[in-house]
């Protein structure tokens, strides 16, 4: 994966266009599909590919929880979980597990029946889109419905490469939701990803409410500059890979 990603970056550095890099990415995706058919011992390759192909479209939704029922008619979690795990173990996707409550220790609150899926390579996420959507994202910089999922994927990829196990929280019957969490000593740090430097209501609630005793401060990633206000550290999205070093 790292060699292939380097080839994409090198091509772009030479040509300053996406034509060559996109061709490389398309070939990587083609190779992935071939590997699925070749190495999916004991699993249905069609099911694995259906999950793989559906990741970008589920990230485009407002509710980014991955819904197996949307992958294929009659699809059920118990029939597809092995496919999801296969893709994760192959280094193709990243699983972000739901928490039943944002509290330490995180492992005691993980619910693997609910999760979000991100592509392990954000460039390949964009390459999976159709031609029109790719031109919107790459050329016109018009992210539209892809903005939230794309920025979340960028941050998720950086956190995983920094050794963070991904988890998120969505409170039932509420708008309270948090994209990621990070443990720093005895603190549980919520991490929210914003397309712009917008207000982070969920972050404020988690920090100020007495119902979340492990949470005292948080991090907000934005398409903007560094700042710190009301116990919220604001960072540009590109710096996500530095987060464990910054807060550790």
Task: State each model region's role.
Residues 2-185:
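Accessory nucleic acid-recognition modules appended to NTPase machines
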Residues 122, 193, 223:
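Residues immediately flanking
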Residues 127, 200-201, 227-231:
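Switch/connector loops and helix/strand junctions flanking conserved nucleotide-binding motifs
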Residues 133-134, 207-210:
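Short, solvent-exposed amphipathic alpha-helical segments in soluble enzyme
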Residues 171, 213-233:
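Nucleic-acid nuclease catalytic cores
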Residues 188-198:
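Active-site ExK catalytic segment of metal-dependent nucleases
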Residues 197-206:
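Active-site-adjacent loop/helix micro-motif of nuclease/hydrolase catalytic cores
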Residues 224-248:
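Domain-level recognition of nuclease-like catalytic cores that cleave nucleotide substrates
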